[in-house]
UniProtKB/Swiss-Prot annotation:
Domain HD: 163-279
This protein's encoding gene: yhaM
Disulfide-bond pairs as recorded: none
A GO BP entry: rRNA 3'-end processing
InterPro entries: 3'-5'_exoribonuclease_YhaM (IPR020873), HD/PDEase_dom (IPR003607), HD_domain (IPR006674), NA-bd_OB-fold (IPR012340), NA-bd_OB_tRNA (IPR004365), YhaM_exoribonuc/phosphodiest (IPR050798)
EC primary class: hydrolase
Sorted UniProt keywords: DNA-binding, Exonuclease, Hydrolase, Nuclease
Name of the molecule in the record: 3'-5' exoribonuclease YhaM
Family statement drawn from the similarity comment of this UniProt entry: Belongs to the YhaM family.
Amino acid sequence: MSRGILYYQVGEALESYFLIKSATKAVASNGKPFLTLILSDHTGEIEAKLWGCSPEDEATFVSGAIVHISGQLSEYRGRQQLKIGSIRPTTAMDQVKVSDFVRSAPLSPDDMLEQITQYIFEMKNPKIQRMTRHLLKKHQTAFLEYPAATTNHHEFVSGLAYHVVCMLNVAKSLAALYPTLDTDLLYAGIILHDLGKVKELSGPIDTTYTIEGKLLGHISILVNEIGETANELGIEGEEVIILQHLVLAHHSKGEWGSPKPPLIREAEILHMIDNIDAKMNMMDRALERVQPGEFSERIKAMDNRSFYKPNFHEPPLDLS
């Protein structure tokens, strides 16, 4: 297998295998159909166009298919794109499998679970601790495998758990600076805030939105589950409502998906930590293939901005 799409520079020829993450049909200005393919390998993703595609191409080059491509890395409107020279479906003779093309979190699921469990052990409020532990255990397998999103940030295998671990570590540092923060609430809110995504999303590979995800969303899903968990465990009190509020308000604004803004201190900080970690992941991913003195591709979720890597920073990759 080749060195990976992340390691190629604009103008370089390449020949490699890719997993098709999505295939979208459209019609060009000349009236001919084409496919926009999002291709991935173990290092990253890239867009490619398959011009003048036939009905057979549409049936062959679908989401989840593994293909062999020869082409050249190019740039279009500030974004890298793979110019396809030839493309074919793979066969058993190629000896490739889907797991070869999936990017994963830099920490193992066991390591992440151990870290998260330690934060739960540190909780002093038994009601908050029990509800958090119960919900995590209920969804543990999916939680450790799922991405945090379909696009934008932590959209890789185990991305959801990695997002939570990073947020918890930020929260611990902030709590040391601001001792008025209730770490039980903050840690529980971080662990639970995106847990509804195990029902909102379809799985760790070829991730799409489920019917529940489209009609309810991860916030509503988890708010309901917190209530059900409290009933199941026989827990009453304000802790239940506060945990629900933490999940409900973590997007901060109605136009961002939260029906209520943060109205307690820990909910506001939870939103900020979530935003920091998501944006850091987006910027880090965009700057991975950028050399010092260059700008990244535009990041749609960050006002379509490009980010600059200062000249005095070390190159990110050994491209030899």
